[in-house]
């Protein structure tokens, strides 16, 4: 990005604004609270407390045009091979809508629709049985997305199925889950793109044995033959996924099977509708009015121009408590790259460390560091305008904290006692959902997906591969025999010492 024609101008704006006080920016642009706000369907965004002004934003958008961001969106939606290292499309948008006239995208949408109807039929069959509980086994993209959505949208009571998620290879996770269940009234779903994932195979074997066979086992995989063979699952209970959908973008596919069981098939379709509506906004809205573009460019500004190494996400709705963990994978696995599309080294820092938690709990853990620490941490505050629980006073208090914390972080407060002084200058974006509905959550997740893509285009990196996860897995498979007592040549001296400790 530093090699673009507009970078010097952008850098000059950063030098000008780096030490600017956020109240001064608001005073200089009196209409800023509304001019820097956007409403897209059920989502409201306010960027007024970010440390840029109109001139800096214009410079950011100039680089986005130089990087052909609009063309990049067209290539994504039309199913071109934007995943250049694996020579694949990234057609997660086609799982939820048919928004272009590109044949490859339309065919992908039709294929996804057919599989979704198959999934609906399987749900109807399960509803006709005595099954009350579902154990969903997967990891990474096969777990984080479904777990987030199921937890966020499940009814407080009265759901037809209770869905339990197991991801970690640690046997304690499976033991604790199965201890509360009756195998005669439980079904299992094994989700793995390749069906070669160690965690899923080991946990799947435990579940298969506990259920007493494969009669109530289902699978979702891009390798359905291997899935069926590994656990003797009838082909009719195996749903496909595809190599043109990355795991962290796959909750909209049959990977969402446990979501549909947890919240109902109709509400699962509403989730997809909300995402598709936001997709349409991204595809059809000029860059300057495009919320995903503004969110992504804000992240680039904070990372590359203001030097922020981390980004916090605070969800002021307990039902969204798992969103920070989901976004960690979406953002950091997509953008944790050090080389550009052509294999040359990047010319600027890429992804920040994303982290966070649920408010107001986080105010009593790490907010001390946000307010008075030496690092400035940009943040997203996410809340809901309307709650649907009967405790209105609690929701009012929750939203008061959103308003108070974002104001305090931005404005600070002077004191004659330095221990009680707040420097301010901490930027944040506020995102408000009208209510936590399937449509709103679908739109919110879609926004973050597209924000990630914006950042990848600005940095010239591939958001859709993840080779960085492979080396550790390869080494683990080589070391496993050594932990079982076999003779293995281990070159690393520290690993040898640790092996000796583990083997006693």
UniProtKB/Swiss-Prot annotation:
Pathway: Carbohydrate biosynthesis; gluconeogenesis; Carbohydrate degradation; glycolysis; D-glyceraldehyde 3-phosphate and glycerone phosphate from D-glucose: step 2/4. It catalyses: alpha-D-glucose 6-phosphate = beta-D-fructose 6-phosphate. InterPro entries: G6P_Isomerase, G6P_Isomerase_C, Phosphoglucose_isomerase_CS, SIS_dom_sf, SIS_PGI_1, SIS_PGI_2. The keyword Isomerase applies. It is found in: Cytoplasm. Mutation in pgi results in the inability of X.c.citri to utilize fructose or glycerol as carbon sources, to grow in plant tissue, and to cause typical canker symptoms. Belongs to the GPI family. This is Glucose-6-phosphate isomerase. It comes from Xanthomonas citri.
